[in-house]
């Protein structure tokens, strides 16, 4: 039942009819489909984005200049650039790589360098911060056994050899951080974690 619905949800909608864009029906159908009918994981949503976009291209028959094509693409782009659930930003990255960066957008969009530079900048910030993707290497202070020791040079995070690496980002003005950091420090000093590196 799920597979049938997923593949036939838009069967009775003429995806080539741009008049639908002037009604609330089409956008609410898109939101219902991507929010409620599909599993909320990138592996389920990404193929359906491509399936829908290809179907619109065939039915609208105007290439990348079609209004249904671009309005649907833009709606999905806006929906997933700030997703509700962690991990769904992979969909935004996929849309950027497959459609915007490869030029599968209307010429007026592709030629708008200010807009394209802005969204490419957003893409560049997100592409290495996805779940399951290696983070950009970080340059770190090399410290002695005690944090009060003098600075001992620089190292890269990728050069740290350990089974586990815990990176803890905190703010000096954070009240909760002021309480929890001494507990982390105590846990590190008194347990086997220090011996294991």
Q: What would you call each of these model-derived segments?
A:
Residues 150-184:
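Short active-site neighborhood of thiol/selenol oxidoreductases, capturing the structured segment around
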Residues 128-130, 156-160, 191-193:
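Short, conserved, surface-exposed binding loops centered on an aromatic residue
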Residues 1-148:
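Oxidative protein folding and maturation machinery
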Residues 135, 161-164, 195:
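Active-site lining segments that contact anionic ligands and/or coordinate catalytic metals
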Residues 74, 97, 176-179, 186:
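Generic detector of well-ordered secondary structure
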Residues 178-197:
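Structural microenvironment flanking redox-active thiols in thiol-disulfide oxidoreductases
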């Amino acid at each position: 039942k799920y597979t049938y619905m997923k593949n036939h949800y838009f069967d009775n909608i003429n995806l080539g009819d741009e008049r639908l864009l002037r009604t609330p029906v089409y956008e609410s159908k898109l939101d219902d489909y991507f929010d409620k009918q599909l599993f909320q994981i990138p592996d389920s949503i990404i193929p359906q984005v491509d399936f829908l976009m290809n179907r619109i291209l065939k039915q609208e028959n105007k290439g990348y200049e079609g209004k249904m094509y671009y309005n649907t693409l833009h709606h999905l782009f806006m929906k997933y650039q700030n997703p509700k659930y962690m991990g769904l930003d992979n969909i935004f990255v996929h849309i950027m790589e497959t459609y915007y960066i490869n030029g599968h957008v209307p010429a007026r969009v592709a030629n708008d360098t200010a807009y394209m530079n802005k969204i490419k900048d957003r893409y560049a910030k997100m592409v290495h911060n996805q779940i399951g993707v290696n983070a950009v290497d970080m340059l770190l202070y090399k410290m002695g056994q005690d944090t009060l020791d003098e600075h001992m040079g620089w190292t890269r995070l990728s050069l740290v050899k350990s089974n586990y690496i815990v990176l803890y980002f905190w703010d000096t003005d954070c009240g909760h951080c002021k309480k929890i950091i001494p507990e982390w420090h105590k846990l590190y000093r008194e347990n086997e974690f220090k011996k294991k590196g």
